[in-house]
Structure formats: C-alpha cells, structure tokens
C-alpha cells in the first residue's frame, strides 16, 4: 500500500479524526432540564464550593489536552500549528483506542515559551492532564518545567518521556537476555535532545551507574566549552563522571549498550565491533536508524532495537502514553513522576515471561491487549506510593 497517497485520500474523506458525542440523552424536556438549565446550576454550585468536585461532576477527570506549537512535527520539522493538527488528532485517537482517555488537540500559534505556558495554564482547569507534543528543544524543556511548577495536573512531554519509558522497558529485558546487571554496564547515549535527555535521566533513576552522552561534538562532560547549553550542562553533571572526551567512536569502545536518538548512520559496524561482548544496540532514529539491525548484528551486537515496525523490538510510544495517563487519571494524580515512569517500564518488561524472552522479543507488541491494564495499574499504584495520587 502507498501509505502517503492512501492517507491523504482518507484524511480528505474523514474530514477530521475526532468528533464530540454526547454521553446523555436530550430527547425530552426533563432531559434538557437535567443536562442544562435549570438543573445544571446544582453541580456548578458544588464545584464553586470545592473545585475538586469538577472531577466528579464533569468529564475533566478523563480529559487530556494534546498541546503543540508545530515546531518539531514528526520528521517534518517546523511546519506550524495548523499543519501539525493531523498528527495531534491522530495522537488523540491513540489515547482513546489504547487508554480510553478522551484527548483533544490544542495547536497554539506561538513560539514564545511564556505565552504557551500561560495559554495552557489558563485552560488547565478544563482537563485532567496535558500531553506536550512535537515542540522543539530546548523550548520543550522550559515549557514542561514551567507548566509543572504552575499546574497541579500531570504535564507530560511524550517525545521525551514516552520514548524513555519504552527504552527502559527494552533495556530491562535485554539485560536479562544477555545476563548483565544495570550496575555493571556502560551505556552510551547518542543525542542530546529531548528524547536522549529523558532516556538518560530515567535509566539513571532506575540504577544504571555509567552513562556517557554524546552529541555532534562528541562526549558531553563537565567543563566542555564547545556546543554546550544549560540542559547539556545539567546532563554533564549527571553523566560521564570520569569526564572522558572524544568522539562517539571513542566512547563506544567497551560499551555494553548503545542508545541512539540522533541521526541515520551515526553508528557503524566497525564501531559495534569495539563494543563489549553481547552488545545491546537501540538505534531509534526514524525513519532511518543509526544502524540497521543486520549491520549491527554483523558487528557482534546480540540485541538490536529500532523505532521501526518492520524490524523486531520496536520502540513504540503507544505502549506508554495511553496507559500511563489511564493510570494517572484513575487516581487523579497531580503529577507523572519518575516512580510512575519506572513502574510503567517494569510493567511492560514483565509482560514478557522468561520463557518467551529472546533476542527478537524484548518489548511487547503495540497491539498486546494486556498492556493497558498492566501499565495503568502499576502507574496508579506508583502514584499512590509516591504521594501524588488524590484518590
């Protein structure tokens, strides 16, 4: 199938992938008086007395806003908020299909951090959570940070944390297959953008000790002058504690794990040959990975994962964000924290039994029917245990 031509045709037929459907009947005078005036005044007054009642008397409890400024849409780049709308609608469809979450797109015509933050904050009383989507770095970090400080609902940048959750799930199972522990491995993360930063932070939170981040300049380390910014400075303090300098090729020597969220062809077969025995390669650049699975295997990699559906072990965010929000909403969480993300990763990893686990099956399939319940329950429990659940 030619997906480009067929998708364009279908979008023309669909004229939007979302619609509003009433949950209540309005076929009699009594129906109208209950759903609207005069009866509707009573829940309004209850919410006025206690804003938390908005979760009980409206659909706020299950509503997520999918927010973008259109500056980093898929691999298309800065195409504008209107052009990003088909992606945001698609994201909302996935929220409903895989998490039973009611999601609505909000495409903002601004690139100003404070303007975007203020816009989302001012309407945050209408929803139970916010999914930030396709916002270019480094502004995505600033927007998420400021919204988390201002809002008392989950603020989640999927391009960062969704990718990190699936990557950690895959890493947990990959380590089981090769018989290594998180404490002993050396991990090289190639890329210093949104996804790379979140992956690095999450695997460190999980207990991985030795992580080196690389960008176009080479290894990121504390004291490096070239090509740094405040976000890389932060990562330099958390990673590469020996302050090693050099190229990506230098850093992967002796590494157990390569995680790429960078550029096509960044890793070569020759570089994989210099890695440790039973190397694990996560080549997640899309649509062309840092290295293709056959090339990585030729270099000695035992496990290879990509972001593509035509190869085994796909890093697919749809395994995370719908069920993650489902779990957060079920306990009316105020935040999505590291504990909840790690719980989601562990739940995903544990869906694959030791008997099923192998080099080509370390991550559940996108359509695995067990994902929603397993992840949402684990996330909800982690929210309770970490003190961010309201109920």
Q: What are the functions of these language-model segments?
A:
Residues 1-155, 376, 381-382, 386-390:
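N-terminal ligand-binding/catalytic initiation module
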